[in-house]
């Protein structure tokens, strides 16, 4: 015979007291992520102090000659477009400018130990090898604010110490914003980290302003603007540095510019 077991709780049976509901902990506030496309706003006092220190160090380690500084606008937004031979180009190219500058720097720098230095210099990232629309918008925004944008259109340092074919981003930004482009030629900087007190020359060319041929900016407009700036840079360089633009300088008959020396 099967015996039925009554499982109903009877009075007096031991019961577990109800557990109080656990209080829900408020979510911890998350630290807002840094917007790397907004350059760090270095305080003016700190920036000019760093600039003074950089000038002092540069005076000790190299013999710097600066040409055509009078070609650089004293106000308003503009682009500095330079050839790129060495890491040293980054502090050398704008070191004699009185105003603060911002840079486009490759994305890898922002994930390295150099990230804090890059941010302090006022740089924002760009993804190389692809059309980084966010970086282009950030560049245009900086120019709309009246800032100076330093660009190295070749995209990286030249391993052969000669000019390589430029990317089109600089030409596109110049056409979209309408700001002047100051071509800059630098040479000798490839020796700055290898020799003691080598001669380094920085030559600032005349500002160039570009407009589209028609109502809309075309690929041809962008390519022509980019090539015109690069030919101007090549024309200021000694022949052995001109690289892929050597033939174009000779073909167009462009004579090397000879800006007068400017005081430091």
Please report, for each region that a protein language model flagged, where it lies by residue.
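A short beta-turn/loop motif at secondary-structure boundaries
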Residues: 70-73, 250-251
């Amino acid at each position: 015979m099967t015996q039925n077991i009554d499982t109903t709780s009877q009075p007096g049976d031991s019961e577990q007291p109800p557990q109080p509901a656990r209080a829900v902990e408020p979510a911890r506030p998350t630290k807002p992520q840094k917007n790397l496309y907004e350059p760090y706003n270095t305080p003016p006092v700190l920036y000019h102090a760093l600039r003074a220190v950089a000038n002092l160090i540069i005076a000790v380690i190299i013999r710097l000659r600066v040409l055509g500084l009078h070609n650089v606008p004293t106000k308003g937004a503009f682009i500095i477009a330079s050839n790129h031979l060495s890491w040293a180009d980054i502090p050398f190219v704008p070191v004699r400018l009185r105003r603060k500058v911002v840079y486009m720097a490759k994305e890898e720098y922002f994930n390295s130990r150099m990230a804090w230095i890059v941010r302090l210099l006022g740089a924002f990232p760009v993804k190389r090898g692809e059309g980084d629309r966010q970086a282009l918008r950030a560049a245009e925004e900086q120019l709309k604010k009246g800032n100076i944008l330093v660009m190295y259109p070749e995209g990286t340092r030249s391993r052969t110490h000669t000019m390589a074919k430029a990317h089109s981003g600089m030409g596109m930004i110049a056409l979209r914003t309408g700001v002047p482009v100051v071509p800059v030629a630098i040479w000798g900087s490839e020796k700055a980290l290898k020799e003691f007190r080598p001669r380094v020359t920085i030559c600032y060319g005349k500002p160039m302003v570009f407009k589209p041929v028609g109502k809309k900016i075309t690929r041809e407009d962008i390519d022509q603007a980019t090539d015109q700036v690069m030919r101007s840079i090549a024309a200021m360089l000694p022949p052995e540095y001109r690289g892929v633009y050597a033939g174009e300088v000779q073909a167009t008959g462009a004579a090397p510019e000879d800006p007068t020396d400017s005081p430091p």
